[in-house]
């Protein structure tokens, strides 16, 4: 991590994600070693909010999570931010209510990847219209080789995406794309971001062509 920070410079944003994999003792050791690496955020360094609260006693690095338990976050003082997909919260309207509650409680929020172009268009609009979201949101666009919208898949330029300006969400459902993706799902099953069916046993190289 120190080598990465040195290579990208002090000003580049660096976020980490352990996907709840570390034990509390391991996380303590890791965070102690990278405390001076200017880490913007560490996502789910441990498996529970309770462990995260104990970890907070040993590190000032901000924590985030995909688990939308605001009540427990307020009680324990961690995580600092929620990173949530709109479908988890039940759609745009419920997401806006959740963000408003986060703001009232002083807990940060940014968006997890919208996956398809429809979900991504939704979170682009919400991010643009919601002042409480002031950190860059996540995306998995580099993994996408197809989409269900005529305008997709989205391709960021210099790490930025414009907000769609057409009516509604600003994107158009592609019936052909939907059929194509449906047939692929039936044939290959749930999409695996890591497995490349063209190269069994090897990880996909990013970005996908």
Predicted regions and their residues:
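Metal-dependent enolase-superfamily TIM-barrel catalytic cores that perform enediolate-based chemistry
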Residues: 1-55, 59
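Charged/polar, solvent-exposed surface patches and flexible loops
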Residues: 6, 57, 125, 179-180
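Residue-level signal for alpha-helical context at structural boundaries
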Residues: 22, 52, 141, 195-196
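Active-site-proximal flexible loops/turns
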Residues: 24-26, 50-51, 92, 177, ...
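Alpha-helix boundary/capping residues
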Residues: 34, 102, 130, 181-185
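Shared catalytic-loop signature of beta/alpha-barrel
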Residues: 38, 47-62, 68-168, 172
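Extended hydrophobic packing segments that form well-structured cores
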Residues: 169-209
């Amino acid at each position: 991590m120190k080598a990465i920070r040195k290579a990208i410079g002090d000003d580049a944003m660096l976020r980490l994600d352990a996907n709840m994999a570390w034990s509390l003792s391991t996380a303590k050791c890791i965070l102690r070693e990278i405390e001076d690496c200017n880490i913007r955020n560490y996502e789910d360094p441990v498996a529970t909010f309770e462990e995260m609260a104990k970890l907070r006693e040993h590190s000032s690095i901000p924590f985030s999570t995909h688990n939308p338990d605001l009540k427990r976050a307020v009680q324990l003082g961690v995580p600092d931010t929620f990173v949530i997909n709109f479908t988890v919260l039940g759609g745009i309207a419920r997401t806006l209510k959740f963000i408003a509650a986060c703001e009232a409680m002083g807990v940060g929020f940014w968006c997890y990847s919208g996956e398809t172009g429809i979900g991504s268009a939704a979170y682009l609009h919400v991010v643009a219209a919601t002042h409480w979201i002031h950190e860059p949101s996540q995306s998995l666009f580099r993994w996408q080789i197809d989409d269900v919208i005529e305008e997709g898949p989205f391709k960021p330029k210099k790490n930025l995406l414009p907000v769609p300006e057409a009516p509604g969400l600003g994107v158009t459902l592609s019936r052909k794309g939907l059929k194509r993706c449906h047939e692929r799902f039936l044939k290959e099953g749930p999409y695996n971001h890591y497995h490349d069916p063209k190269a069994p046993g090897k990880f996909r190289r990013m970005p996908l062509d």
